[in-house]
Amino acid sequence: HVWATLKERDAVIYKDNDFEIFLDPDGDTHNYYELEVNALGTEWDLIITKPYHDGDMVALDSWDIPGLITSVHVDGTLNNPSDIDDGWSIEIAMPWKGLIGNYRSNDSPKDGDQWKVNFSRVHWETNIIDSKYVKTERPEYNWVWSPQGIIYMHMPDLWGLVQFAENTIDQKTVEFKYSDLDKIKWSLRQLYYKQRNYFFANEKYSNSIRELNFFKDLKLKKPPAKGVSWPPKITLTPSGWEAFVKWENKNIIIRKDGKVWVK
């Protein structure tokens, strides 16, 4: 059965069955994009300043993706409980110019560039009562492209990576390359999680790798990439903490609210 109820743009679309796209072009886990569309083609697009669990999050749902085009195809009927449908599909086009304001470049991605991305399909179970779809008391469930191990989409560090290529698949096989920068960011993310656990236990942060038991994970004993200064240097700040490593004459930095960036 294919059904949808919400018709107003920027309504809370996941209250219907929907399809969702999450994009973090620069991979810093902040100021990422979310787009949700239901079977009526109703759109909810927003910028989220940081993940909900990092506090002081703002969801800018007054923002619209410039030039966004969506098209829904229903293989069957919509909102007709009397028959059985095969499903629905959606095609989405987002102009680069609508997204690059949050990207490290003012141009579209180059060959080999990678973005953090995830997809989700929210589904509600229903019963048909008096010829109407009525949700059961069970919560919705999600099918996702890159599983995160938790029913919670707002963990950009756990999203998948999409690599851009100039060649189409019928021209040439393009090798996916897991970048050294992403390996470094992931290792710094482990420090972030250890700081959170330490704070919950001690109500303060630590500038000591030893106190954080950072090397309990044996994989963290080795630098995540060649030429990385290791382990990270931690500084306590008025707002919490920051940590960095040096790599290729740049600093890779992470801070208390999870933002990770290159300077």
Language-model features: where?
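Structural preference for beta-rich elements and adjacent junctions enriched in aromatics
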Residues: 1-192, 196, 226, 236
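General beta-strand recognition
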Residues: 20, 89, 242-244, 253
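Short, surface-exposed charged micro-motifs
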Residues: 34, 233, 251
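Secondary-structure transition/turn motif
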Residues: 93-96, 244-251
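Short, glycine/small-hydrophobic-rich surface segments
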Residues: 179, 190-224
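Terminal low-complexity interaction tails
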Residues: 201, 230, 248-253
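Surface-exposed, charged secondary-structure patches
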Residues: 220-246
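A short, surface-exposed beta-strand/turn
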Residues: 249-263
